A protein has these predicted regions:
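Short, hydrophobic/aromatic-rich segments at coil-to-beta transitions
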Residues: 171-177
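Short, surface-exposed loop or secondary-structure junction motifs
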Residues: 1-171
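Short, well-ordered beta-strand elements
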Residues: 187, 194-204
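Short, small/polar residue-rich loop motifs at catalytic or cofactor-binding pockets
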Residues: 182-183
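Short strand->helix junction
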Residues: 21, 204-205
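Short, surface-exposed charged micro-motifs
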Residues: 160, 186-188
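Short, gly/Ser/Thr-rich active-site loops of penicillin-recognizing serine hydrolases
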Residues: 121-124, 140-147, 207-226
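Short amphipathic alpha-helix initiation/capping segments at coil-to-helix junctions
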Residues: 105, 150, 154, 178-179, ...
Length: 226
């Protein structure tokens, strides 16, 4: 296509339906059996009620909603006001139980960092393969580099991954791939340093400059230690 319009829901359902049609399993079950269990990760798309006690209760600072209320300069706020997005929706049992592949994964930072660490090392670690080199190359090849038609912001996307501007300031590099999340969370791979990084939070914040100071301090410490 020639245009990009970011949407947090549809991409996962489209990819998830391919998994259902080709493999027969749901996206959550496929990921659990083919990726999560073999690699010893804590990651769920469709959280069982028996695991509820391990899930963080989400909350948000009032400023976390500023980007939804940013006015009528772009169509972006409208997309998240139909109905208005709530930071506490993930606390509901129905949301946790559902499989919304692009939006309701439940994971800890260690598991996300491990996953991206394997990808940062080319998809294979210790003789175990998560993705072939060719599959990883195709997954991270730039599909769109331009202006998002909804947010009007510069955007670079591969097959689901954001490319480049994922960390902040001195820790942004063209080869990074991963994704940011509302309120400060982020997970990405830095292939040049063979590094996987993740920061997740139960307390969503808002930032005038777009940089979460918690994430910034962690990134500074990690890169200083390399």
């Amino acid at each position: 296509g020639s245009r990009c319009v970011y949407h947090a829901m549809t991409y996962g359902h489209l990819v998830g339906e391919l998994i259902r049609r080709i493999d027969g399993r749901s996206p959550g079950r496929f990921i659990a059996e083919e990726i999560v269990r073999p690699w010893g990760l804590q990651f769920h798309i469709g959280l069982a009620a028996s695991e509820d006690h391990r899930a963080a209760e989400m909350s948000a600072h009032e400023k976390a909603y500023d980007w939804i209320r940013q006015g009528e300069k772009t169509a972006y706020p409208h997309a998240f006001r139909n109905p208005t997005l709530s930071a506490t929706t993930p606390n509901a049992r129905a949301w946790r139980a559902a499989e919304v592949p692009a939006a309701n994964g439940q994971a800890d930072a260690r598991s996300l960092a491990t996953l991206y660490g394997v990808l940062a090392c080319g998809g294979t670690v210790g003789g175990r393969q998560l993705l072939s080199a060719d599959a990883l190359r195709r997954a991270t090849a730039v599909r769109f580099d331009g202006v998002d038609a909804c947010s009007l912001a510069p955007t670079v996307f591969a097959a689901g991954y954001r490319i480049g501007a994922i960390g902040y300031g001195p820790h942004v590099a063209p080869g990074h791939f991963g994704h940011t999340g509302w309120g400060g969370s982020v997970a990405f791979a830095d292939p040049a340093r063979r590094l996987g990084f993740a920061f997740v939070t139960r307390r969503l914040l808002g930032f005038d400059d777009g940089v979460d100071p918690r994430r910034a301090r962690l990134l500074d410490a990690v890169y200083a230690a390399l």
